[in-house]
Amino acid sequence: MKIRVGMGYDVHRLVPNRHLFLGGIKINHTLGLLGHSDADVLIHAICDAMLGAANMRDIGYHFPDTSAQFEGIDSKILLKRTTDLLAEKGWNVGNVDATICAEHPKLNPHIPAMKACLAPLMNVTQEDVSIKATTTEKLGFTGREEGISAYAVVLIEKMNK
């Protein structure tokens, strides 16, 4: 069986008057992430990791922020489309390991809902999706609560034909 690994990263600025979406779910917070789409940094990092593992460029190539088609789009749609793009090339997701960096809100209570939301979009079980939350101990832009970042590593497997 052929396997590959990809790594993804994304970051967005926190701003007022926006909803906060992380891992496909809406989280109550006083600020939201600024972006062309819903700015879900976790999903964007996972998409980049998937595309990188398959040597299919990156999320901006497939879903450019210059396109009106993707303005305000739900990132869950982008994740499902990314899963489909990989399947067209014969790849399945094996597992995901991701980390979200944010001072606030506290994210650990939301991780089970994130896993339940994301797993079916990638055709994997919740056991195949690891999501962790951490802070930067008040260092840098995330420490100053100016933004949220996410990192993801994805293993993909070549489908048997």
Language model: regions and residue ranges:
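RNase III-family endoribonuclease catalytic core
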Residues: 2-112, 122
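Short, low-complexity, polybasic intrinsically disordered segments
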Residues: 111-115, 145
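Glycine-rich, mobile lid/loop segments that gate access to catalytic sites or pores
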Residues: 118
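Short acidic capping loops at alpha-helix termini that bridge into adjacent secondary structure
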Residues: 125-128
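Pyridoxal 5′-phosphate
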Residues: 131-135
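Short acidic, Gly/Pro-enriched loop/turn segments at secondary-structure junctions
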Residues: 138-140
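C-terminal edge-of-domain segments
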Residues: 142-161
